[in-house]
A protein has these predicted regions:
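Bacterial Sec-dependent N-terminal signal peptides
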Residues: 1-21, 312-315, 351, 376, ...
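Catalytic active-site module of serine/aspartate enzymes centered on a nucleophile-bearing elbow/loop
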Residues: 293-310
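Acidic, glycine-rich loop-and-strand cores that form catalytic or ligand-binding grooves
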Residues: 220-257
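Acidic catalytic loop of the alpha/beta-hydrolase fold
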Residues: 205-208, 284-286
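C-terminal outer-membrane/trafficking sorting elements
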Residues: 315-390
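Serine-hydrolase catalytic machinery in alpha/beta-hydrolase-like enzymes
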Residues: 26-39, 45-151, 168, 288
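A domain-start/cap signature at the N-terminus of enzymes
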Residues: 4, 17-49, 61-62, 75, ...
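Short beta-strand/loop motif that positions the catalytic acidic residue
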Residues: 199-201, 205
Length: 390
């Protein structure tokens, strides 16, 4: 369930030492909890808040680099870290499961190496939902927060935790987007209110299976929650959305062996919606525009901000796809777009450092004055990561 980011040009300490991206700790219920905090350099009015929840065994430093800062420079972005979990084997041996959210993930009457080890509910006694809400309370007390724009996204186990927060705290959370993680086996579906939800899942996911959320870990096989389609139907039904979705097929332009389908279910009276992106052939990872037909970060941002994917005419001047090369780059980066586009380059703190207009062909951009590090090139709302390395 751990997502591994291969960003070699930006050391994790760069984020920790940045004026806008800092590592924080909070004393919560007798435990020192850790999280990464990104505050806009120049706030403009009330700020939305986004929580990013990592997968099993991951950490907040690693997962803080999804790239939302480039798309949403006025958002506060918080990446909390889960606590370590252990699995007791017959009370004799404790197996370290890595960092895990108390999201109701587990199963009943499980066996390991031929021995019955009973029920497992990872980190059952940890109050992770209280920790997340305590961070939100602190932000509301210290900043001008847009309380109508509180979002959570999570990958794998972070997706399970996102759905738990949606079920239990719709009064505080505006919308969630879960990726490769559904609703945990031990988490009852008893929502406190309607909430917009998005789910993204690959049909070939072997870590959290598409059909039944089957999970295999160190020889322990268990169904840990709802399958992908069952989760979407559960939220669609609760939100009383139409049974007939708006279907959007993403253009298949990359040679990645994948196709992406989006299903949007709406409740026209309340405005609530449930969105599902089905990744045919997709596995347990976070897909990005550099190599794939869509970029998860961009699609989640569009969902949170109410932007919808609709078919565009051939005359549209919006760059539907663009590529960058070389990447990493040293002094020159080439940007190829299929239509006219406005390009912006943002640094890792979300500050725009360059803006260029293109004519739909290949544009060479001089980046020699920019220091080494992680950047984001954004073309009409679509972002790609760029590493500058010399």
């Amino acid at each position: 369930m751990k997502k591994i980011f291969t960003i070699v040009a930006l050391a994790l300490c760069t984020f920790a030492l940045s004026a806008q991206n800092v590592e924080r700790t909070m004393e919560f219920e007798g435990t020192t909890r850790k999280y990464m905090e990104h505050i806009p350099a120049t706030p403009n009015g009330s700020m939305p808040v986004l929580f990013q929840l990592h997968g099993l065994g991951d950490n907040c430093n690693n997962f803080s680099q999804l790239g939302f800062e480039a798309l949403a420079p006025n958002w506060i972005i918080i990446t909390p870290e889960a606590t370590e979990a252990t699995i007791s084997i017959m009370g004799i041996y404790n197996m370290n499961a890595g960092t895990a959210w108390a999201a109701g993930v587990g199963g009943e009457n499980l066996s390991y190496s031929g021995f019955n080890i009973g029920d497992i509910n990872l980190n059952e006694g940890v109050n992770d939902e209280g920790f997340i809400l305590a961070i939100l309370d602190s932000l509301e007390n210290n900043f001008d927060i847009n309380t109508d724009s509180i979002f959570i996204t999570g990958f794998s186990m972070g997706g399970f935790m996102s759905n738990k927060m949606a079920v239990k705290h719709a009064d505080r959370i505006t919308a969630i987007a879960s990726v490769s993680g559904t609703l945990g086996h031990f988490q009852p579906f008893e929502p406190t209110g309607n909430i917009n939800t998005m789910h993204i899942h690959g049909t070939s996911d072997e870590t959290i299976s598409y059909a039944n959320a089957d999970f295999n870990f160190n020889g322990i096989a268990v169904q840990v929650g709802l399958g992908a389609e069952a989760l979407v139907e559960t939220w669609r039904n609760y939100n009383q959305c139409s049974t007939e979705p708006i279907v959007y097929n993403f253009e298949d332009t990359k040679n990645d062996g994948l196709t992406f389908e989006q299903y949007t279910y709406k409740n026209e009276e309340t405005g609530n919606k449930t969105v599902f992106i089905k990744v045919n052939g997709g596995v347990h990872t976070w897909y990005e525009a550099a190599r794939n037909d869509i970029d998860y970060t961009t699609e989640i941002y569009k969902f949170f901000t109410g932007q919808e994917n609709v078919p565009t005419s051939i005359e549209s001047n919006v760059a539907e796809n663009f590529s960058i090369y070389p990447n990493p780059a040293a002094n020159i980066v080439n940007v190829k777009t299929d239509r006219n586009a406005e390009l912006s380059i943002f640094n890792a703190t979300g500050k725009e450092v360059k803006h260029i207009s293109t004519n739909g062909n290949t544009t060479s951009i001089d980046i020699s004055e920019l220091p080494n590090g992680l950047y984001f090139i954004v073309a009409n709302g679509i972002a790609q990561k760029l590493t500058i390395e010399r």
